[in-house]
Amino acid sequence: MARNANITRETKETKIEVFLDIDRKGEIKVSTPVPFFNHMLITLLTYMNSTATVSATDKLPYDDHHIIEDVAITLGLAIKEALGDKRGIKRFSHQIIPMDEALVLVSLDISNRGMAFVSLNLKRSEIGGLATENIPHFFQSFAYNSGVTLHISQLSGYNTHHIIEASFKALGLALYEATRIVDNEIRSTKGVI
């Protein structure tokens, strides 16, 4: 069974198109109006070992908020669809990733109970067109829509770029590991996820 998804989400504010294949490492194409966000999405999708296309159009370009939120929603929905009934997935994963002085822990459970707990000390208010207040919001929107319980904690660091990038790398690696097929069972005492 192919584990991929093609999701389009259009509102009065944005149009987001996401193609995601979680089992095939291939080309990654990302186009949003926020340069640093493009860099982080490419990082996330690369460390997920995926093939992906993300295209985001901001119809009402007030600021970066709508793009960040709507890409997170659409990407979350794509992961959820690609996983189907989640039969056989490892389900849990955690990663502790350094980037120079920054050290970030990501722990997740593909539980179908989407929520995020994010503890990052981001000193800069903006980086590459992205308001750093939208970083936790990205993770929250992604977690809610993907059905992933997500914890992200900064263990050390002071460089905003390094902290954010370590977070996206760790999330990508954790998602890759948690979505691997390890058997043919649903990993839950309930029998469903």
Curated annotation (Swiss-Prot):
InterPro entries: IGPD_sf, ImidazoleglycerolP_deHydtase, ImidazoleglycerP_deHydtase_CS, Ribosomal_Su5_D2-typ_SF
Protein name: Imidazoleglycerol-phosphate dehydratase
GO biological process: L-histidine biosynthetic process
PANTHER family for this protein: IMIDAZOLEGLYCEROL-PHOSPHATE DEHYDRATASE, IMIDAZOLEGLYCEROL-PHOSPHATE DEHYDRATASE HIS7
Keyword Calcium (UniProt): no
Main location: cytoplasm
GO cellular component term, pick one: cytoplasm
Database matches in Pfam families: IGPD
Keyword Lyase: yes
Known EC number: 4.2.1.19
Top EC class of this enzyme: lyase
Catalytic activity: D-erythro-1-(imidazol-4-yl)glycerol 3-phosphate = 3-(imidazol-4-yl)-2-oxopropyl phosphate + H2O
GO molecular function, one term: imidazoleglycerol-phosphate dehydratase activity
Gene name tied to this protein: hisB
Gene3D superfamilies, sorted: Imidazole glycerol phosphate dehydratase, domain 1
Locations listed in the record: Cytoplasm
Pathway: Amino-acid biosynthesis; L-histidine biosynthesis; L-histidine from 5-phospho-alpha-D-ribose 1-diphosphate: step 6/9
Family, similarity comment: Belongs to the imidazoleglycerol-phosphate dehydratase family.
Keywords of this entry: Amino-acid biosynthesis, Cytoplasm, Histidine biosynthesis, Lyase
